[in-house]
């Protein structure tokens, strides 16, 4: 996407400084909006859609209705039932109207700061200004991580951004689902120092049933990385009881990792950090009754992986 000046723009929902995740050292993480998968356990649901989205924090809301009076579209209504207030807060937002809004007048009207927007169109210059201000912390193996959503859904913007990072010798980590055309990946491979990709479910039919899409293109792109630079890949599998945690699935993923010569797999135990984010988006969390796997189960799955000669790290 380009603005009136012909500058590339992308929808960014967060830029985190001083991060110690998804790459070595201290990093600046840039989070892009838009994802092709719809994993029911998603911890960042605000990353899925490509448009700005309203976030409502019910604990900050006092029910003053200033937001309703400011909204020109009538998207905000009061909740009066005490039980409903306890569950979702003082106000209801018609998300079909909120998603189309471009003025967000409710934000400036809310002095309690109960409202915010996930998603802002930014130019490459905008993002680089935020990256450059952290440059001093990149000296000790730190760098820039592009994440999402999926940054590879913004290939023109991403290529320019990573080229700029490369010119300044910032090391770059890419966190991507790789569910994108292979040409999108190939365009940025010269600038990537580390890859972090989930391989959630090895069976393509089951993958489509759970996430909404087949994993054919994901596996194709992983094989490409395996052919060119396998040592740069950290393959990850979230361990979601009832979805990804079967011995058969983990064995299949580990076999694939070994085939691609990926040296390391990370397995990540299920958590419920996404529940609050779903509440703020006004969406329903799909796995309220799923519990994290036991330590014994995690170590059992790690043993299956390491039997294939792939180092396993439990995160």
From Swiss-Prot:
This is Indoleacetate decarboxylase activating enzyme. It catalyses: glycyl-[protein] + reduced [flavodoxin] + S-adenosyl-L-methionine = glycin-2-yl radical-[protein] + semiquinone [flavodoxin] + 5'-deoxyadenosine + L-methionine + H(+). [4Fe-4S] cluster 3 binds at residues 71, 98, 101, 106. Catalyzes activation of the indoleacetate decarboxylase OsIAD under anaerobic conditions by generation of an organic free radical on a glycine residue, via a homolytic cleavage of S-adenosyl-L-methionine (SAM). InterPro entries: 4Fe4S_Fe-S-bd (IPR017896), 4Fe4S_Fe_S_CS (IPR017900), Aldolase_TIM (IPR013785), BssD/PflA/YjjW (IPR040074), Ind_deCO2_activ (IPR054981), Organic_radical-activating (IPR034457), Organic_radical_activase (IPR012839), Radical_activat_CS (IPR001989). It comes from the Bacteria. Its cofactor is [4Fe-4S] cluster. One of its GO terms (molecular function) is metal ion binding. S-adenosyl-L-methionine binds at residues 149, 198-200, 271. Residues 52-81, 89-120 form the 4Fe-4S ferredoxin-type domain. [4Fe-4S] cluster 1 binds at residues 35, 39, 42. It comes from Tractidigestivibacter scatoligenes (Olsenella scatoligenes).
